[in-house]
């Protein structure tokens, strides 16, 4: 399991999902805005790591039906998909819910940017309906249309893998000594990130999967856990 200070989320982006048609991003980057003089908000809510200033908490504001809840739903299901076994498409299926008036057959886009051990990583994928759907609610009714991972290598952003359809076109993942990650994917809905993590317990994919698995608790998928964690945090803050 990753320590809290080892991994931090920088931003999360969504496109063509439920009420969200155009690309929308939740950013945890601190801006140059300052709180009133004497306020402790900045010092208590901003954490700095490797020269990057990030917010511990953010708020979403907007009109009714503007997509606030759907952004959180997307993040919750995104993390849930990474937690799910490669054989099961149920983790990916809730992420295929394109904008109602989208007629181009474009897939649903999701991407997260993380700071992992001082290095920035950008991971994402596009979910679309399967080309051959045997029946309603079939386990094969969705597929990963594309998937990618970029990371800082020698201070430059490098593509670590690229998957198009069910084929891994490029694999530059650094692995532990003696580890070989097969690029053949068992199912169209299998995430290569999860697939790679299963073969290298110390690699970058496993570290990303661990963060999404243990550190992002969505109030959509895990309502009771989210409620319990929230109550404990409030109680702790109240005592202090």
Regions found by a protein language model. Name each.
Residues 2-77:
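Pre-Walker A-like glycine/lysine-rich segment at the N-terminus of P-loop NTPase domains
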Residues 5, 44-59, 63, 72-132:
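Conserved P-loop NTP-binding catalytic core
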Residues 7-8, 105-109, 139-145:
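A short, compositionally biased
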Residues 14, 112-118, 149-153:
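Short acidic, glycine-rich loop/turn motifs
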Residues 18-20, 32, 84, 131, ...:
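Short loop/turn segments at secondary-structure transitions that flank enzyme active sites
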Residues 20-22, 117-121, 155-157:
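Short acidic/polar mixed-charge low-complexity motifs
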Residues 122-240:
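Electropositive, glycine-dotted interaction segments
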């Amino acid at each position: 399991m990753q320590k809290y200070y080892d991994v931090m989320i920088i931003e999360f982006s969504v496109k063509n999902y439920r009420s969200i048609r155009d690309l929308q991003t939740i950013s945890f980057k601190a801006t140059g805005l300052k709180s009133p003089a004497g306020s402790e908000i900045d010092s208590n809510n901003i954490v700095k790591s490797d020269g990057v200033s990030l917010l511990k908490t953010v708020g979403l504001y907007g009109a009714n039906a503007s997509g606030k809840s759907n952004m959180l739903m997307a993040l919750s299901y995104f993390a849930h998909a990474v937690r799910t076994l490669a054989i099961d498409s149920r983790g990916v299926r809730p992420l295929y819910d394109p904008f109602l008036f989208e007629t181009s057959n474009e897939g649903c886009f999701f991407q997260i940017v993380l700071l992992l051990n001082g290095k920035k990583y950008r991971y994402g994928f596009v979910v679309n309906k399967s080309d051959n759907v045997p029946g309603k609610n079939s386990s094969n009714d969705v597929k990963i249309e594309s998937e990618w991972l970029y990371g800082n290598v020698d201070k430059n952003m490098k593509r670590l893998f690229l998957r198009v359809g069910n084929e891994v076109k490029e694999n530059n993942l650094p692995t532990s000594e003696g580890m070989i990650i097969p690029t053949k994917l068992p199912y169209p809905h299998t995430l290569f990130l999860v697939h790679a993590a299963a073969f290298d317990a110390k690699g970058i994919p496993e570290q990303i999967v661990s963060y999404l698995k243990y550190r992002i608790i969505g109030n959509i998928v895990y309502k009771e856990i989210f409620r319990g964690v929230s109550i404990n945090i409030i109680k702790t803050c109240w005592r202090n």
